[in-house]
Amino acid sequence: MTPAAPDAPATAWAVEPSGPLRGEVRVAGSKNAITKHMVAAVMGSSPSTIHNVPDVGDVGITTEVLRSLGVGVDLDGDTITITPGDGIVPEVPLRYSGLNRIPILLLGPLLHLHQEAFVPVVGGDRIGARPVDFHVDALRAFGAEVTETEDGVRAKVAGRLVGTQITLPYPSVGATETVLLTAALAEGRTVLNNAATEPEIIELALFLQRMGARIELSPGRKFVIDGVEKLHGATTRLEGDRLEAFSYLVAGLVTGGQVRVGGCAQERMVTAISTLQRMGAELDINDDWISANAPDGLRAIAIHTDTHPGFMTDWQSPLFVLMTQAEGMSVLHETVFEDRIRYPAMVVQAMGGEIELFETCLGGPACRFHDSNAVHSAVVRGVSELRGAHVEIPDLRAGFSGVIAAAVATGSSVIEGVHHLERGYNKPLETLQSL
């Protein structure tokens, strides 16, 4: 696996069939946690320090966004220090439009600082519709006046944001983050019902507690936050990236090898581990490492993605490739993001994967997309003989699927668009080359 030939695009890799991938990978901190911690640190009255920071593109983008606001950001190896300072401005420049979804999370913190804020249109992976309605509705519940324009979202408030009671229509991770960040400095008590409780959400809540926030998690997806007058800086170490850990375990299994993954605690991987076991994988687990192999081959499975503690939606892309190497007919039902399933399917189909897509709910209970036209279920027939191809990957998660599919395929592949991988995986090229 190498950068592609000189006449190929700069963001392309040439991938030859690898044979069994074997070795050890120690994952860094969670890509889905680090950027939210960086936003939280903006609200502190003193610097915050975060350790075990992954070397991913989203950290670079968020660093640029924060610096454009006047926030000090210093990255030293895998440690980042955020220094809020007194000169923070309330508007994220339009040049950061569409790069990732972090700007929308800045609305609450900027409103606390300036009583007004503007963020440009957000971006992120191509995984179907990802409207900002839940964020906007939550901010309005706190008393903000919010206006959506073609360029972005503008908000203002007269005085201080006020605690409120919010019940999310769906346990959205992003909306839960917006509420936690906004409620921490709001006047009075906020009660958030039907909240997301993913490990990265709990990490954010714990970091805010270290900064002085008063946050309680109650049974039944309920957060209670009592707003405080001021937050201070804090120090924390990020937990390992569970998506990256699963991806490398799957890379070993897909190629008939065995990858040993460290840096991600077992409790963050419970549903991933049980899913691999159902497919016939043998897991070796201790306090430091998780490894998986399948000496007797892989079995087909029916599974649906879900909010935590269910099977993580980000895990479905590498699972697609694993299903092509499992004996029998597998079913995958995506219930979190409409149309997300199209993108990894498109990449794997280009390499010969036998995949049929459906608009109906298969492999699990009926979901919120059951009466829509969204493609959100797939049937995957295995074992498929994948073949090398020239493919362009559309997003981060589908990108890793393309790379590991190319590793097990017959013949050479060129994978374009690997900048998507570098946005979310920690040093992916050198990590894969080490296996």
Model-derived features: positions:
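Short, structured segments at the rim of ligand-binding sites
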Residues: 1-435
